[in-house]
Every structure is written in structure tokens, then in C-alpha cells.
């Protein structure tokens, strides 16, 4: 038996928890603020459901084999309340978050060989606690090594593609290029289909060009045509698909703006690279949240 705890079972975390629980020898716990009776996910393969253990407090928890951290980056402090109870000497911790700073908050507190940063592209939306819509099977990428390979094995029974990659830095910045463009959706409160509007697409390209410049300075191998690749991906997606930044702004929740666009501004400044487009959307979305 493999014990797995998922901290923050929102759209992506809840979807992953449901898939993990489809394997009988996985014992899954979800760590939540708002309890629910079961997980129910509409997936491209059909509906799946699961009844993991639902924990609303870490008090009764013990260390597990795996912890999946799927909370937003601004919830790191709250995440430690759970990690203190769930992490033992052999526990591995996978960090499934947006951005390129996955492990930084955990270095020095959890042994590096037991940390697995993960880049995730699984379009999913949560309609209520425990209820998700997964629009595409999607993929997860983790660094090469024993921990990354062990993490990939957890999903061998699922249709989600798992890739163990040599150059994780490049993969993380490629995903950030996709995420940073999504700020346009949050600004105009329109789903993926807005990328068919050439004016919106040009703003998206500007955001991605800055991401490419900063990512290269950080050591990522990013192609010149990445902005066009990102737009093509948006245009090929379900036009009604809503990214998490858009969903959070529409719902009046805190936005993961720093991890998706602010990091480009911060890292750009450190390298002397101007990032006016990303700085502008950060300023506008911060103002919109006032």
C-alpha cells in the first residue's frame, strides 16, 4: 500500500487525487478547508469518483509515503501546518504549482532528494468542493532522478502523461510562457477563445516574449517562436476553457499573479531586462483586486 496526501484539492489537486484513488493500493487523504463527501470528476475518459479520507485538521494525521502540494503559491505558510504532520524521514514531497520557484520555499526544511518539483498542464475547473471538470488528460513533467521516476509511477494507471525530463528548468519556463499569457484572460474576463482576437493575441505575445528573454537569462532553452506556439495552443484549446487566474479574479479570490507574471518582472529586474508588458498586467490586476 502507498499512502498519499494531497494538500489543496482544488481543480487540479482534486482531479489528481481522484485519479490516484482509482488504484486500489493507493490510500489517499485530501487536506481541505471545506469538507466534502466524495470527489467527482468529469474527465475525457468519462466520469470518475473517489471517497478518500477527508482531513480538515492535521491533528490526527501521521507521516505518509507521498505528499502532493497543490496549493496556490501564496498559501505556502498554511501548507506547513499540514506538512509538519505528514512529512516523516522517508516522505517524498511533490510540488505541483505554477511558476518557476517550486522548491524555493521548501529548501532547507525538506531534504532536496525528497523534493519533486512538477510542471502540470491539466486544464481543469472546480464547480464546487470535490467536483471538477477535467477538459483534457494533460501531462505532468518532473526532473530525472529516483524521486521523479517514483512520482511518475504513481500515475501509471491513469491516462495522464508523465514525463521525466533532463532539463526541468526549460520545461518550467515553457509552462510559465503559457501561464503568463493567461493574464489577458483575467484582465478581460473572457476564456481561452479570446486568443482568436488578434489584438488580444498580440498582447499575449508581448507577455511571452518577455518571458522568453528572462527565461533565457535564467538558463532555459526557449525558442524564438514560443510566443506563436502559445497562441496556437490557446486557439486549439476548448474556447470555453478558463485558466485559474481568470477563475480566481471572476470569483473575487486572491490571484496567483506573482507566480505567473510578477516573477517575470522580478527575475527580469535582476538581469537588467525590461518587462513592461508583464509589469503593466501585474499593476492592472492588482488594482482590479483593490
UniProtKB/Swiss-Prot annotation:
The places in or outside the cell where this protein is found are: Cytoplasm
Supply one GO CC term from the record.
cytoplasm
Q: What is its EC number?
A: 1.1.1.169
Pfam families hit by this protein: ApbA, ApbA_C
Q: Which domain of life is it from?
A: Bacteria
Q: Which residues bind substrate?
A: 98, 179, 244
Active-site residues, record numbering mapped to chain: 175 (proton donor)
The record's keywords, sorted A to Z, are: Cytoplasm, NADP, Oxidoreductase, Pantothenate biosynthesis
Q: Which cysteines bridge via disulfide bonds?
A: none
What GO molecular function annotations does the UniProt record carry, in alphabetical order? Answer: 2-dehydropantoate 2-reductase activity; NADP binding
Q: Where does this chain mainly localize?
A: cytoplasm
Catalyses which reaction(s): (R)-pantoate + NADP(+) = 2-dehydropantoate + NADPH + H(+)
| GO BP term (any one) | pantothenate biosynthetic process
Family, similarity comment: Belongs to the ketopantoate reductase family.
Any idea what job this protein has? Catalyzes the NADPH-dependent reduction of ketopantoate into pantoic acid.
Q: What is this protein called?
A: 2-dehydropantoate 2-reductase
Species, as recorded: Caulobacter vibrioides (strain ATCC 19089 / CIP 103742 / CB 15) (Caulobacter crescentus)
